[in-house]
Amino acid sequence: DLFQVIKEKLKELTGGVIEGIQGV
């Protein structure tokens, strides 16, 4: 399912962003 893949990529992206904010 394409939507599922997009959702997973988005989750991965936001997860990295949150990690970056917490790292600072």
Swiss-Prot record:
Transmembrane segments: none annotated. Keywords: Amphibian defense peptide, Secreted. It comes from the Eukaryota. GO terms for biological process: defense response. GO terms for cellular component: extracellular region. Expressed by the dorsal and submental skin glands. It is found in: Secreted. This is Citropin-3.1.2. It comes from Ranoidea citropa (Australian Blue Mountains tree frog).
